Structure formats: C-alpha cells, structure tokens
Amino acid sequence: MEERGRRKPLYEMTRELAATARGDLPATLVIRDGTLVSVTSGEVLPGMSVAVRGPRIAYVGPDAGHTVGPQTTVIDAAGRYIAPGFLDGHCHIESSQITVTQFARAVLPLGTTGGFFDAHEITNVLGLRGLRLMLDEARSTPLAAYLEVASCVPSTSTELETPGAVIGPEEVAEALSWGEDVIALGEVMNFPGVVFGDERMHAEISAALRAGKIADGHFCWPPDDHRLAAYAASGISGCHEGTTPEDTLWRLRQGMYAKLRRGSAWHDVAATIKAHTERGLDPRRILLVTDDRSPESLLEEGHMDFVVRHAIAQGVNPVTAFQMATLNPAERFRVSHDVGSVTPGRYADILLLEGDLAEVRVSLTVAAGEVVAEGGRMVAELEPYDYPAFCLDTVRVAGGLGPEDFDIPAPGGGERARVRAIRVVENHVETRGEWVELPVEGGLVRLDPRKDVCKLFVIERHGRGGGRGAGFVTGLGFERPAALASTVAHDSHNLMVLGNSEELMSRAAREVVAARGGVAVAVGGETAVLPLPVAGLMSPEPYEEVARLSREIGRALRSAGCRMNYAFMTISLLALVVLPELHLSDRGLVEVGEEGFRLVGLAAEG
C-alpha cells in the first residue's frame, strides 16, 4: 500500500519494529492485559498485551512492560477483548450515498478499519477520473482502503445501455499501476460474457493477472454446471452473489472464495452460511461482506460488526466469524502481511470489545496506531475533502420531463395491451419477468388502478445521446398516486423514473435534476428529496444528515404503500441489465437468459 500519511510500508520499519519488540525503542502505544482474539491460531488468549510503534504492531505477548517509555500511551484493556479491525471483503461505498470521508466517519467507530472497495458506481459516471477521485479521498482517511478497478463499464455493452464512460483493458491496466492499494479487478458482472468468451472481458481479466492482481466475480447462474467452471477457469477467484448453501458449496469446490453477503436489502448470509454450519465446510475461504449498506442502516444497525454478529447468530463460532471478517479477506486479497490480524509487523488496526464476544460491542478503534474512535464516536478529526467541479455537474438530461413525456404508446391496436413487466423480489438482486394486461386509451397504455403496476422509465443523463427506455414494474405495492426519480440507477446510473401518476413522475424527475442528482419521492402534494450532487450518487454532507434524508425517502415510499425492506435499494437495481431476469435501460428492456443478453420488446411477440 502506498504511504498515506499515517501508514508506512513494512520495508521502511523493520529495524524500528524489531528494536521496539526488544525494548530498545519505546512503543508509541501499548494495549495492556486484554483477552486477545487470535485469528491466526483460532484461540482466545487472556492476559495479552500489544505494543505499537507508529502505524504498526511491534510486539504481542503476555507482558509489554519492557516497551513502555515516558511518552508511551498505555490503554488498560482488562475485561475487554483485543481483536483485529474488521475488513469488508466487498463493498461499494457509493451505495451508502455518502463520500469516502463520511463513510470513514460512519464505520470506524463500528470497528471497520478497512476493506476492498469496488468503485464501479462512480466509474460508470465519470470513468477513471471518478475512480481516481475515490482513491485520492480514501488515501486521506485512516482506513486501510484497497480499491478495485471497475471491470464492467458499462455492465454489458453500449448496445444495451449508455454509461457516462467506457472502460476497457487499457484503462484497467493504467489504473492497476496507480499503487499497491489498487488491489484487484472489480467484480466481473458480465458473467455471460466471460463464460461465452467476450473479448473485452477476457482482455481485462488478463490485464489484471498480468499485473499480478486478482479478479473478483459476480456469477448469478446455477452453480452446478459447466458455466461456473468456465467462469473460474477464466481467472476469477471470488464471488459474492451466492444466495443458497449450494452456491457456497460449489464456489469453494471450484477453488473460489465464497463471499457471504448481508447488506441492507440483500439477506443472503442466513442461507449461504449453512454450507459451513450444517454441512461442515472449511471456513478458511469464506468471507463476510456487505456489498451495499444504506446510510440509515449504517447508523441504526451497523456495518461489519452487524454482519459478524448476524453470522454468530446463525451458529458460527465467534472466532470463526471474526476470521471471516479479518484474516480471510486479507488472505484472499494477498495483504495479510499488512492487515487482518493482531500480530507483529501488521498495521495496528485494533479493536477493543466489551461484554460477550458474540455481542460484538466495539468500544475503541485504533487505525494505523492511532485511537480514532471511542464509545461509538470519532475522536479523530477528518479533514473535509475538496470535490472538483467535474464531479458536481453530471446530470445532463436531453428531452422533456413533462407529464406527457411519461406516456407509453400502445403496441398495436385494440382496447387492451399485453406487455412485459419487471417484478421486483424483496431482499434479492434478481427480478422476474412477467406479462400484464393493461387498458389502452387514445393509443396510450394506461395503468389499471386495481393492479400493482407502475410505469418505469430510464432516461440517459450523461449527455451521450439521450436514449429513453420505457416499461412497467410490478410488486412495489403502491396504494395511492406516487412516483420516484433517481440518478442512482445501477449501474449506468441514468435517470430512472417510476410511478403510477405522470404528474408526479414529472415532479419527481424535475426535483432530481434541480438537485444535480439524487432521489425524490412524490406522494400526493408532498415531495421528499435526497440531493446527491457528487456524480449524482453521493452527498458530501455529514452521514447523519444523509441518513435522515434517506429515512424520509423510505417513509415516503411506505406512505405510498411500498413496504419492502429498504425498498430504495431494491428499486435502484431495476436498471441493472446484467442481472437476471428482466431489467430496463435507456435502450429498452434487456433479458438475461441461458445464452446471455438480448433486447426484448414491450409487447407480446406474435
């Protein structure tokens, strides 16, 4: 990892650390007489102490008194556990709708001291400039933040969707040269492309492997046939898209790392962990990850502390659960020499925990040798980041946003139209395709108030051609006139507008454009707005304020009748055309079938 203020590479500190361990140099920090969670040996060891010199650990043992000098800070850990800081094995910071600095403020008090962050949201909007922005800001925080280079920009192809930028093998190779903290090729979402030999996908994977980096995965087909083997044989060695014990089983059998996800809206751990708890699979290649966490869930539930606690509640041994969130991700990403354990030479990313270990109650966080949080609050000040103008003006919508612009012409004649619709699935990333019959009036498809159907539009907002896709979505549960508009619309992040009232769809869309990006929900005469001006994805405001506004979005959706768990996160995937089964882009409806992707019409064929 590049030196980032507080963090120095090990090769610069070997003599200094050895001298501190001998007692010839004083430690800068000593944590005394705690119970060590040794993730490297699998033990829980009482009466242990840790001596730290600068950003790294010099000594771990029963007594660190020989390392204490006049200026050494000594923390008494009696009655508390000493554990390594948590690492998120797969996370999109942008999904929390807060900037990296605010993300660090939110998660450090919860015990997350680092992670492996795939910034493909902002890269789909701003290309390499966006990725570099995230990297530079991450380097200014106490986090051990390792970034992955977005692999699928766009997630499929420009024939199927319009992103704000396009990334190929040359861009991947360039970004991987930016430093050791650019750790991997991000999740290769175009799994059909990999399986069926897409040239761009394989060239990007090759670029990562040539650079000595790893490639991360995203595989959504059933795991027990030749396609997962083809995916793994292409050099992709980890995946977080499993939803069943069999998914975990087969990923491990194919030599991959299985990442078990518990995000705000993706509740997969309860099922996927059974491969370990019920079938006895070795946990050494199992990771716990969040993928996406909303700002209010960070505030109300937690981050990796919540996921570890949840895994323990499913029957995982507490030490094993800690390994899944510390040592295992560090080993998966080949950085266990720096992070993932409380052992000599590693960064001093250390937690003190109170109560029973299974409760995962973090009372103090040390990051790179500095106490950064205590009692659930930051004690270290983080400097605000100065965001450049190019990332604050990214919403460029061509065409109108009046009520009439949300009319959908009827496909064919007659008084009824049989049309495709996308059915959302609560707490899952995939959708289902279905047929619905709707009335036709004046040549336009109208909604039937007796049916749970909304209109759905995806409108290109990057100034790259002005495409506009139209369709229908079911399963939202709206019981009164309502609409939602958002520039958070994975993964191309165009302007998505849905609703059962053209007037309200127009109002919500205009509010989002006026805010320079964000989310708006219009219900009756009220409109809730969450401005996200940084690339149309994130707010630079304090995370507590963003969480408050995000709660208002959730309340507005519930007032309309949409009661799904963290409904916005599920809704934001309606344009993610790389996922099964049916999604909408600015180019139209895209179906993922056994042979890959295809554009399909709105009307019944034949």
Curated annotation (Swiss-Prot):
The keyword Disulfide bond does not apply. InterPro entries: Adenine_deam (IPR006679), Adenine_deam_C (IPR026912), Amidohydro-rel (IPR006680), Metal-dep_hydrolase_composite (IPR011059), Metal_Hydrolase (IPR032466). It comes from the Bacteria. The keyword Manganese applies. Its cofactor is Mn(2+). GO terms for molecular function: adenine deaminase activity. Transmembrane segments: none annotated. It catalyses: adenine + H2O + H(+) = hypoxanthine + NH4(+). It is an enzyme of class 3 (hydrolase). Belongs to the metallo-dependent hydrolases superfamily. Adenine deaminase family. This is Adenine deaminase. It comes from Rubrobacter xylanophilus (strain DSM 9941 / JCM 11954 / NBRC 16129 / PRD-1).
